[in-house]
């Protein structure tokens, strides 16, 4: 299949089907409505199942059921809808059920607006539900990467037995770009012998849940989860480093925002200013190793939120140099000229 001009939401939905998604459960909410609309037709054509659930809560619990039976299952929503799913996502993590959760983010808090934003960073990376759990969070910056990350998310979910987020936003969902959808398995996956998919008289029944009434057993389960998360942190964290080798000032941004910041870096470089960019491609695990930049004297987090990524940057650099923030929330996007003005102000005599 060659490259096709596609809308982001449809490209991500098509990528899910290419990766073998057999069950999609969703509920309408802007700006991701094209995804369930697309799935309602194409999922049946591909031999899968589509259900428009009665609520976001119902949808995530349907994912729990399908994933627990060993089927590749997915849901999509946007910020307030993802918030409603948090209990179910905690259950998925606790029961170690693979699932893909696509969040096409919009402005908040509350109902907020339907405009693009990045204000769900904390909810996704630091666990919005109860308990000590983590979910891998993949953050695409263009439609090709969005489609690729959707396909990768299914493999990652199966390999680690965990729910996986793909953190897009309204821009990624609504823009159109050329995309080529080719599914290439990333991991060597094993048969799901743990799944509750029927004994067929050949084995003992499997029980898939997150309930441990004995404190010692629950503690052991939590230790097991943390060991798994440590493996994910070691193997899966990644970022794009753009002109960071000699940079005095490094801007940090992800997703759609990084497209603007890349142009800002190019502007500074044209002036002979040593400015670079780190673009986290995984929000969790956060790409700590990408921040090993001994020349850097200042980091600036540029976000479509009110600074939710700053603390992770400070932890990554162990607060050795200053970290500043510039961003906008509620659906507004920092313009290149605004970023340039703030970086000059923050940098002072550094640049």
Segments (PLM) and residue ranges:
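Glycine-/acidic-rich phosphate or pyrophosphate-binding loops and their flanking alpha/beta elements
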Residues: 7-11, 227-249, 262
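Thiamine diphosphate
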Residues: 1-127, 134, 142, 329, ...
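Peripheral docking tails and interdomain loops at the edges
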Residues: 304-351
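Conserved thiamine diphosphate
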Residues: 115-165, 169
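Short beta-strand segments
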Residues: 100-105, 138-140, 165-169, 302-303, ...
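Conformationally flexible catalytic loops at phosphate/diphosphate-handling active centers
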Residues: 161-241
């Amino acid at each position: 299949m060659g490259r096709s001009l596609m809308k982001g939401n449809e490209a991500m939905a098509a990528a899910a089907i290419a990766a073998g998604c057999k069950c999609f459960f969703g509920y309408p909410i802007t700006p991701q409505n094209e995804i369930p609309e697309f799935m309602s037709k194409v999922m049946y054509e591909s031999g899968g199942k589509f259900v428009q659930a009665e609520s976001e809560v119902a949808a995530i619990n349907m994912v729990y059921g399908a994933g627990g039976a060993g089927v590749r299952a997915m849901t999509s929503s946007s910020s307030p809808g993802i918030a409603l799913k948090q209990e179910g996502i905690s259950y998925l993590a606790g029961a170690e059920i693979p699932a893909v959760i696509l969040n096409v983010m919009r402005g908040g808090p509350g109902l907020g607006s339907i405009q693009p934003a990045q204000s769900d960073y904390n909810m996704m990376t630091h666990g919005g539900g109860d308990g000590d759990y983590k979910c891998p969070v993949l953050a695409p910056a263009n439609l090709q990467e969005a489609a690729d990350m959707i396909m990768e998310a299914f493999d990652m979910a199966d390999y680690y037995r965990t729910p996986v987020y793909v953190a897009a936003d309204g821009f990624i969902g609504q823009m159109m770009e050329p995309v080529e959808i080719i599914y290439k398995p990333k991991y060597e996956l094993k048969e799901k012998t743990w799944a509750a998919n029927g004994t067929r008289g050949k084995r003992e029944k499997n029980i898939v849940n997150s309930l441990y009434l004995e404190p010692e057993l629950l503690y052991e389960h939590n230790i097991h989860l943390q060991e798994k998360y440590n493996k994910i942190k070691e193997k899966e964290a990644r970022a794009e480093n753009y002109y960071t080798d000699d940079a005095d000032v490094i801007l940090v941004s992800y997703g759609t925002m990084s497209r603007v910041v890349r142009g800002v870096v190019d502007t500074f470089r044209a002036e002979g200013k040593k400015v670079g960019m780190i673009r986290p491609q995984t929000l969790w695990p956060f790409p700590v190793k990408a921040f090993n930049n001994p020349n850097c004297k200042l980091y600036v987090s540029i976000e479509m939120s009110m600074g939710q990524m700053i603390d992770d940057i400070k932890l990554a650099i162990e607060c050795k140099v200053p970290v500043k923030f510039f961003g906008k929330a509620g659906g507004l996007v920092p313009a290149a000229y605004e970023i340039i003005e703030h970086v000059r102000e923050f940098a002072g005599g550094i640049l």
